[in-house]
């Protein structure tokens, strides 16, 4: 009986993974004006490859194969330059554009339809056990170089501009920008 359950479970998992892959490619085509077709995105987008690697590693993490999940996610990081901890929780249609230097911590939670650019960190401000990484709502855009740090909440529809450091919760439908620069 357990073999039948395992086979059924794996069939469902692979069907969901395939659907997630298709949704991730569709999100890239919708969000990146330079993306020309499904095949190009499938073959050449390291952000997409990192997300798929995360989805496999997260499955391994959930079924208690944590060492294997960490080894696999480390390999994905070496190949893509993008580090997503397998314990993080990431929603549907997640898109990382360019991707190099992205770090997403173990207790981060990311909603659906989120887009982040290169060199973004969803990190901790402490090394204490427990929830220490941000929770990001749905339909959020995080610009390149932004750092979102600590156990904070980023509301739905937020846009965080480039190179902003966010250490406090942000309400829904808000734009976060650093102060204007000036010439001395």
Task: Indicate residue ranges for each PLM-predicted region.
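Intrinsic structural disorder
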Residues: 1, 180-181
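Terminal amphipathic alpha-helical/low-complexity segments used for targeting or macromolecular assembly
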Residues: 1-80
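Left-handed beta-helix
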Residues: 80, 85-86, 91-92, 97-106, ...
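Catalytic-pocket segment enriched in acidic/His residues
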Residues: 129
């Amino acid at each position: 009986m357990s073999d039948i359950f395992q086979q059924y479970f794996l069939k469902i998992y692979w069907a969901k993974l395939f659907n997630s892959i298709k949704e991730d490619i569709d999100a890239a085509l919708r969000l990146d004006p330079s993306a020309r077709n499904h095949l190009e995105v499938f073959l050449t987008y390291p952000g997409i490859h990192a997300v798929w690697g995360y989805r496999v590693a997260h499955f391994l993490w959930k079924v208690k194969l944590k060492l294997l999940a960490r080894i696999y996610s480390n390999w994905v990081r070496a190949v893509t330059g993008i580090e997503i901890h397998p314990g993080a929780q990431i929603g549907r249609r997640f898109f990382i554009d360019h991707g190099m230097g992205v770090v997403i911590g173990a207790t981060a939670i990311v909603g659906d339809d989120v887009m982040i650019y290169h060199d973004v960190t969803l990190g901790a401000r402490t090394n204490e056990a427990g929830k220490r990484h941000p929770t990001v709502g749905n339909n959020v855009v995080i610009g390149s170089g932004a750092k979102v740090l600590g156990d904070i909440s980023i509301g739905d529809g937020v846009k965080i501009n480039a190179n902003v450091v966010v250490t406090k919760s942000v309400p829904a439908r808000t734009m976060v920008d650093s102060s204007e620069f000036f010439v001395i």
